[in-house]
Amino acid sequence: MNTIKILIGLLGIFLFSLSGIVSAQSDATTQLSQLLSNFRTYQAKFNQITFDGQDRVIQQSHGRVMIMRPGRFRWETDSPTKQIIITNGKTLWVYDVDLSQATQQPLAQKTNINPASLLSGSVKDLKQKFTITISPTPDAATFQLVPNLGKSLNFNWIRLKFSKKQLTEMTVLNNLDERSIFQFSQIKVNAPLSSTLFEFKPSRGIDVVKQ
């Protein structure tokens, strides 16, 4: 399973800055939905490490992520291989730089979870799609989201850690019992981003495969 592709469908729901420390007594789903209105853009560098079911490291990568509401993502992996994933909310591009190959496909609008539906920030939608709990500490909070659709989404749960009012870590456990941890740094919220960052125009020599 490609954890990066799962995150493309999920990341937009989480990229915002907290307006304050989260209260344990408040409803986690409502808090998460309310916080969606706090961001327009998000930029960060990331480091990823993936463990198998025996806690052995099976993958490491790093790069950067950019998001602009509604529905626009750019995920660049620099190592171990260079890959760029872009969506403008309508089309999804996956560009493997070393192979000079890109795949192009429509971004599904009828699937149960996709960036457009998650970015809506609707409490009703969140409750339909996830069971959400929260574990607060004096200076941080962690949300856990368990999909109500079960194994059809290829992951068991996702956890989001917020420190100093920003999302700093994301953990995904997939159905193969592989755990991927993404740590975010050099975070910028609501800084200007050009819409051209979320469009892909292949240069000459790039093989384009349409799906």
Curated annotation (Swiss-Prot):
Q: How does it assemble?
A: Monomer.
- Give GO terms for biological process: lipoprotein localization to outer membrane; lipoprotein transport
Q: What does this protein do?
A: Participates in the translocation of lipoproteins from the inner membrane to the outer membrane. Only forms a complex with a lipoprotein if the residue after the N-terminal Cys is not an aspartate (The Asp acts as a targeting signal to indicate that the lipoprotein should stay in the inner membrane).
Give the main location. Answer: periplasm
Subcellular localization, as worded in the UniProt entry: Periplasm
Where does the UniProt annotation place the signal sequence? 1-26
**Protein name from the UniProt record:** Outer-membrane lipoprotein carrier protein
NCBIfam families, sorted? lolA (TIGR00547)
**Which family is this sequence assigned to?**
Belongs to the LolA family.
Keywords, sorted A to Z: Chaperone, Periplasm, Protein transport, Signal, Transport
Provide the Gene Ontology terms for cellular component: outer membrane-bounded periplasmic space
Encoding gene, per UniProt annotation: lolA
Q: Which organism is it from?
A: Coxiella burnetii (strain RSA 493 / Nine Mile phase I)
Say if the entry is tagged with keyword Protein transport.
Answer: yes
HAMAP family per record:
LolA (MF_00240)
Q: Which InterPro entries match?
A: LolA/LolB/LppX, OM_lipoprot_carrier_LolA-like, OM_lipoprot_carrier_LolA_Pbac
CDD domains this protein is in? LolA (cd16325)
Protein origin, superkingdom: Bacteria
Task: Give any Pfam family that matches.
Answer: LolA
